[in-house]
Structure formats: C-alpha cells, structure tokens
Amino acid sequence: MKRIAFVFSTVPHGTAAGREGLDALLATSALTDDLAVFFIADGVFQLLPGQKPDAVLARDYIATFKLLGLYDIEQCWVCAASLRERGLDPQTPFVVEATPLEADALRRELANYDVILRF
C-alpha cells in the first residue's frame, strides 16, 4: 500500500480545508496505517488549543485532532521555521504531539511518501 502524507498548510476556520483534511485523515486511517501528518506554514495554527471558532460561526473541529492517537496516527511533524515565523514556541502545549523539524529535514521526511494531500 502507498504511504500517504496529509499536509495542513492553511489557518483553521478561514476555510473548510482544515476540517475536511482532518475528516479525510481519520477516514484514511481506517484503510492504512502508513500515513503521517505535517503542519507547515499557517497550518501550524491548527495545533493551537483554546481557539474560539464560534466567533466566526465555525465548528470547533480542532479538539478532534486529539483523537489521532486513538486512530493510531503517530507520525506528526511540524515545521520549526513556520513556528518561529509566526512567533510560536515549539514548547507550546499543542492539541497533538508533533515533532518539530527544520524545513530541510521536513522536506526529506515528506519525500518518503507516495501520496501527498494538502489542506
């Protein structure tokens, strides 16, 4: 079976991309264990707890990221440069445990996957 990477690169609640990506990730995990999640660019904001989506009349799907462990999704990476560029600390308690990688290492890791789905 092909290795599948899910890349979150957009802010949460601005569009439906993050929620749809999470739904696709959870559905795909029922079919394969060979997948990983990457948070890059504005996608790092998907990891922040305490968001208030009701202020923009959006559904709070961020808490659903906490279910990744129950779905045996353990390969989670976050771009360290993206965190720095947005003033976020890698030590922040994110909703999901994601390993920070510098951009070059993240690209090398992402190259190990056959299919890359970006949300």
Curated annotation (Swiss-Prot):
Free-text function comment from the UniProt entry: Part of a sulfur-relay system required for 2-thiolation of 5-methylaminomethyl-2-thiouridine (mnm(5)s(2)U) at tRNA wobble positions.
One GO term describing the cellular component: cytoplasm
Subunit structure: Heterohexamer, formed by a dimer of trimers. The hexameric TusBCD complex contains 2 copies each of TusB, TusC and TusD. The TusBCD complex interacts with TusE.
Gene3D superfamilies: DsrEFH-like
Compartments in which it is found: Cytoplasm
HAMAP family the UniProt entry points to: Thiourid_synth_C (MF_00389)
Keyword entries, A-Z: Cytoplasm, tRNA processing
Name of protein: Protein TusC
Chief location bin: cytoplasm
Disulfide bridge map: none
Family: Belongs to the DsrF/TusC family.
Biological process (GO), any one: tRNA processing
Pfam families referenced in this protein's UniProt entry, alphabetically: DsrE (PF02635)
